[in-house]
Amino acid sequence: AGVEWTSGILDPGTTRIAIAASTLGPDQANAIRVLTSAGDRVAVMVGRAGTGKTHALGTLRTVYEAAGYTVIGLAPSARAARELEAGSGIGSSTIARYIVERREIDASTVIVVDEAGMAGVRDVATIIDQATRVGAKVVLVGDHHQLPEVGAGGAFRAALDTLGTRVVELTVNRRQQHLWEQAALDQLRHGDVTTAFAAYLEHGRVVLTDNPDQLHTRAITDWQQLRTSGETLMLAGTRAEAHLLNQLARQLLANTGDLDLAHEFEIGGRTYAPGDRVVLCRNHPGQHLNNGDPFAVENGMLVTIVDVDDHGVHVLLATGERVVLDRSYAERGWVDHAYALTIHKAQGVTCDHVLLIGPAGLYREGIYVALSRARLSAWIYATSTQVVELDQRHDTGIPLPTETVHDPQRDLLTRMHTSSRCRASRHGHQPRHTS
């Protein structure tokens, strides 16, 4: 059944003024018009990768706050909450923190849940139930074609169909610079893997090797070259492969004089050196900047190792500020190298170049998330042997290599197409769009 009550309806003139003063594209402007006029207590905005959802949400915040509403941002992870706040200006926190703190809301509250496709059913239900009791509005934002949620599963997909909401979608890719790549990602997102793969193949973006050693050597070499033209990230389907790639990257940087392993130190079972790029893997509010100001470390932060001393591990933030992590944080294994990340860890990250390495990550949602992280170029690396082995393990109906002529590129394509891992719930249908 649909949501029967109305909430968050604004004067169309107020919305028009806010849109006119913004730099929104037509699809973004339409989304704001629908969200502020439809009146559904629960609304859904599908924001595919690279379409500028946080920019659009910034205008949504502006128009609602001008009308006297309080806008709250929520996301499954601290990093996603931080990026939502930075991109939209909406004060944001994690869903878990919001539920624990039981923040007071009322009928003049709008709750924006970003990355809703990664949130569990129980968490989303709790947010909606609380909002419904007081008359607040909830806006679920996400993409049902990206990686599935890690909780109970299916909340966002179910909302697309069962909540009776006005579904709006951002459709213009504002991230990738090449038109062919924008088209290929859209094809991949909608399941047309054959056409998408052909485009990457045609533009020389697919690298197949005979064995894993050749694969990793080629990928690391290409990664080193691409680093000179922008921020470059390797992505893997498993933590084991990401770990191996990180070790190879560190050795290459040491060989080229870019990392001084003579001054490396061991802490928490891992070794680090000044200049190492690392990811912080747990929220930890009780840390401090070098000037003594308190600082909250958030899961997923990418930082650079500066030094280690008796006070802790000194790291450099992207802002240029330094944070001193207490030694116990690193000793618990909450710091890891970040030249290569798993695809799940990279969801929400944007960089210049992406190298997707190994067929373990080549299920459809995973490869879409990985390739859509890059602004300038994205590459696919796999060995023909790995692809064949994976095909044999899964009941795909593909003849074994002993039964037919082997085409490694076709095997890779079939692997991508047949190994979609999205855990759709029984409500997992396509959204009903409102134009």
Over which residues does each language-model region extend?
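Conserved helicase motor core of P-loop NTPases
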Residues: 1-18, 30-34, 43, 51, ...
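Conserved helicase NTPase catalytic core signature
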Residues: 2-87, 246, 309, 314, ...
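ASCE P-loop NTPase helicase motor core
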Residues: 41-201
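Structural motif
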Residues: 44-46, 74, 110-114, 139, ...
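Short, charged/polar "capping" segments at the starts of alpha-helices
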Residues: 81-82, 148, 241-243, 386-391
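Short, solvent-exposed amphipathic alpha-helical segments in soluble enzyme
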Residues: 89, 128-130, 248-252, 294, ...
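Short hydrophobic/aromatic-enriched beta-strand-loop microsegments
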Residues: 91-99, 135, 139, 253-261, ...
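C-terminal accessory regions
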Residues: 190, 291-292, 298-435
